[in-house]
């Protein structure tokens, strides 16, 4: 049940290996890339408690020594203080360009460690071992790394491709239902942006995926990674098509900023709401029928996911303030917001031609339901 997706970017091609049991194969999978038998691992406390011993054992069985830095869990770790701590740890460990740093965790750890690897000695290699569904299908693939700023999400970072990605789908069984569904928001995004047949498959298999059907999970992760790899190969540094991967994210990042990048709203939950709002905005602009956002919401709700501003606990800014937060998004070009909208499920496109009053109306109507 092991699948491999090859990501072919100039000078930095690598494999994403997907399936159950890969953690115990960590030693032989990583050993061919090492110039000396040692690695440095950066992880977070929850993953460390569950899986760090197994990874270190797998490495030791292949004669590979390892040292680990364990950071706090949560989005707050994706910040300057923990970047500094990570960089200092790598330097203290005398990491060289021929060494491998392992990012062992979810999207926060992958983004943080990838950025640290990009900066230490002007770039050392790193391996992603993503432990969350969100990281397996999205953040571990494609080379985007970085941290958040108080001004906005992911505003500080670099493109730095991994050397290898090991996506052990068995690890998904240790996620809380909320964390798993947060990642599922990114899976659905792929169907919505470019593969109507995949979205239809998710409508049929979503319950099985959530229930732990391993074959269904491997299929969903593999198709998601294939779609991301195809887009990254065409546009590694987000000059064009790669922006399609941000479907739902213009709304999402504003909502994350409004909720303090914390547990009130997980990233994948924001993506889920953002995708629903992007399809609602598309329908109001006459780009697709109202049946499309209704179908999107129906599937997300059936999976127990957030779809509306009313699903976010606590206070939110008004529509104008949310629009201002959207203006801090890194996709702004010449002061204009770029939206990813859709002509239908599986047919997304990029545009800056979106009247602010229509965006405000979507936000106001969503807030009115709270």
Predicted regions located by residue number:
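Active-site segments that bind and position negatively charged phosphate/pyrophosphate groups
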Residues: 204-320
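Solvent-exposed alpha-helices and their adjacent loops that cap or buttress functional pockets
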Residues: 8, 33-34, 94-96, 119-121, ...
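Generic secondary-structure signature for well-ordered alpha-helical cores
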Residues: 60, 92-95, 161-164, 170-177, ...
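Short glycine/serine/threonine-rich phosphate/pyrophosphate-binding segments
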Residues: 108-115, 136-137, 253-254
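C-terminal charged capping/lid subdomain of soluble metabolic enzymes
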Residues: 3, 185-187, 287-370
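A glycine/threonine-rich phosphate-anchoring loop and its flanking beta-alpha core
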Residues: 115-208
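ATP/NTP phosphate-donor binding region
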Residues: 1-100
């Amino acid at each position: 049940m092991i699948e491999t997706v090859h990501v072919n970017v100039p000078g930095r091609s690598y494999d994403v290996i997907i399936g159950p049991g890969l953690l115990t194969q960590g030693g032989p999978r990583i050993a061919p890339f090492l110039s000396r038998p040692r690695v440095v691992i950066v992880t977070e406390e929850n993953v460390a408690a569950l899986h760090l011993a197994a990874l270190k054992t797998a490495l030791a069985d292949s004669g590979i020594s390892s040292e680990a830095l364990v950071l706090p869990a949560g989005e707050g770790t994706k910040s300057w203080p923990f970047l500094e701590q990570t960089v200092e740890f790598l330097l203290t460990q005398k990491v060289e360009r021929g060494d491998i740093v392992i990012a062992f965790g979810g999207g926060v750890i992958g983004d943080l460690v990838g950025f640290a690897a990009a900066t230490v000695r002007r770039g050392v290699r790193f391996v992603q071992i993503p432990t969350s569904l969100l990281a397996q299908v999205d953040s571990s693939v494609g080379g985007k790394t970085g941290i958040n700023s108080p001004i906005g999400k992911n505003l500080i970072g670099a493109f730095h491709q991994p050397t290898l990605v090991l996506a052990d789908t068995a690890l998904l069984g240790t996620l809380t239902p909320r964390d798993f569904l947060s990642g599922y928001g990114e899976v659905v995004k792929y169907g919505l942006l470019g593969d109507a047949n995949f979205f239809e498959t998710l409508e049929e298999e979503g319950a099985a995926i959530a229930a732990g059907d391993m074959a269904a999970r491997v299929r969903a992760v593999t198709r998601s990674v294939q779609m991301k790899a195809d887009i990254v190969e065409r546009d590694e540094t987000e000059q064009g098509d790669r922006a399609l991967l941000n479907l739902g994210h213009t709304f999402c990042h504003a909502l994350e900023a409004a909720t303090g990048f914390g547990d009130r709203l997980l990233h994948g939950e924001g993506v889920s709401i953002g995708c629903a709002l992007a399809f609602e905005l598309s329908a109001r602009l006459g780009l697709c029928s109202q049946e499309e956002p209704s179908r999107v919401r129906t599937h997300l709700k059936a999976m127990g996911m957030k779809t509306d501003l009313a699903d976010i606990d606590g206070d939110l800014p008004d529509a104008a303030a949310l629009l201002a937060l959207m203006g801090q998004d890194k996709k702004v070009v010449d002061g204009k917001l770029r939206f990813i909208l859709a002509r239908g499920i599986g047919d997304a496109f990029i545009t800056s031609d979106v009247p602010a009053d229509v965006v405000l109306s979507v936000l106001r109507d969503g807030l009115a339901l709270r």
